[in-house]
Amino acid sequence: MDVFECVSTLSSIRVYDDRQADMETMRRVIEAGRLAPSAHNDQPWEFILINEQERLQQMAKYCISGSFIIQVSFAVVVLTDPRSKWQQIDTTRAVQNMVLTAWSMKLGSCWIGRLNEDGLKKYLKIPDSWDVLTVLPFGYFNEKIVPRVKMRKSPGEVFHLNEYGTRINE
């Protein structure tokens, strides 16, 4: 699957089957995050790979909007360095790399943003010097349920040419 096909078919997945990813697959996903570009090459991220089912079950307590984490093959806790000026943008680029790489390997994901960060940091022994940006669950899913039709604004609604207000015709 090429990059544009990944981007155009990507969907948030919240229901997973019981197939397990192997270590090579998990490493490829986090390697995609590590390879993301960053301002001044700061690389303001670290990743915690969680593949023990017992830990995933416990993490559901801290994932306020992501109880589906109990179904996944593995998850990545994405840490970001708050001392880096562009840390949120840079680390989000790493997240997108991981999500698209996983999608290209038929693994679904859904960004979990509502977290009990203090509880999660304590549970995973994350130092106070790091912030948790997100938890990314990854797992295999029934491919018959996706892709669904994406509701997006038309290009004419969001594209401008050379200056704001000059619309690019579709």
Mark where each language-model region is.
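Acidic, surface-exposed loops and disordered segments
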Residues: M1-E170
